[in-house]
């Protein structure tokens, strides 16, 4: 089993519902450690850069508008198979299809306002962590 790092974003809808702590406690209960974290309000430019992979997709503008609608809680999670573990905890992108007990089933309202983002592969995790955190701002625990 490999120790990995992955990026997790608690999106504006979940921040507004004041469930940051409830979501973070699920990561910790699953054995993931938070090795970096911050609350930020993304600018349009930052959101467009972060989601540039979706630039040509029809939902891009709505995604960016949503991600700048309020603060987000950005964190780096570390642990064995952190990427897959985080994705399992999040549940399906559409909360209506998410398994009961997953973060999205419990806290998300729609496929757009779906509470959390998580890296989908080691390469994207490395890029996403670097986007938000310089190396000196991530701490082994």
Curated annotation (Swiss-Prot):
Major site of localization recorded for this protein: cytoplasm
Keyword rRNA-binding among record annotations: no
GO annotation terms (biological process): CTP biosynthetic process; GTP biosynthetic process; UTP biosynthetic process
SUPFAM superfamilies: Nucleoside diphosphate kinase, NDK
Record InterPro entries: NDK-like_dom, NDK-like_dom_sf, Nucleoside_diP_kinase, Nucleoside_diP_kinase_AS
Essential cofactor(s): Mg(2+)
Oligomeric form and interacting partners: Homotetramer.
Protein's name according to its UniProt entry: Nucleoside diphosphate kinase
Gene coding for it: ndk
């Amino acid at each position: 089993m490999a120790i990995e790092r992955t990026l997790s974003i608690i999106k504006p809808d979940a921040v507004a519902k004041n469930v940051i702590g409830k979501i973070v406690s699920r990561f910790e209960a699953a054995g993931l450690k938070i090795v970096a974290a911050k609350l930020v309000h993304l600018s349009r430019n930052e959101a467009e850069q972060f989601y540039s992979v979706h630039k040509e997709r029809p939902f891009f503008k709505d995604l960016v508008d949503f991600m700048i609608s309020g603060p987000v809680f950005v964190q780096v999670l570390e642990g064995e198979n952190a990427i897959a573990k985080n994705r399992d905890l999040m549940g399906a992108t559409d909360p209506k299809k998410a398994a009961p007990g997953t973060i999205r089933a419990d806290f998300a309202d729609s496929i757009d306002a779906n509470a959390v983002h998580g890296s989908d592969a080691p390469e994207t995790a490395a890029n996403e962590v670097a986007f938000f955190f310089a190396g000196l701002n991530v701490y082994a625990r």
